[in-house]
Amino acid sequence: DFAVGAVDSCNGRLGAAGLENVRFRCADARDTGMRAASFDLVVAADLFEHLYPDDSRKVAREAFRVLRPGGTCAVWTPCPSHILEVLRNRDIILKRDISHVDYKSMPRMQDILTAAGFEIARAHYAESHLRGLNLAERLLQRWVPLLRRRIAVVAVKPGDP
């Protein structure tokens, strides 16, 4: 994470969660300074919408670099076509999040990852946590882009673990 306070808070909760092999670090996701091929998993949850196009490519390349062969990069990002994002970006009912500088579509997110060297293992739209709306999303998102809440992509670095 980029926020020291968030990293400190997460690290403070690891003991209670019984997670001894997990550490949160404050770093620039474009150039972490971590050793190459040193991680099994990279999670980019609600990150890519905050990155400009060139930074998105750099972050994907850095994730690829730090993952071991066979390692996984999991991406979770808002879908720009969802009704809540459409309303928010027009300041209708919801306030626009100015930190969301570049929403990615599903094909574009996959292109960013494959250009970095990843193979896409799974890509789907995930429904929201809002009751009622999530049922409609689950049933209809295939045909109604306004109901595609989240883009979820699991990408793998080729090679044997």
Outline where the language-model segments fall.
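Short conserved loop adjoining the S-adenosyl-L-methionine
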Residues: 31-36
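S-adenosyl-L-methionine-dependent methyltransferase catalytic module, highlighting the catalytic core
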Residues: 2-9, 13, 17, 30, ...
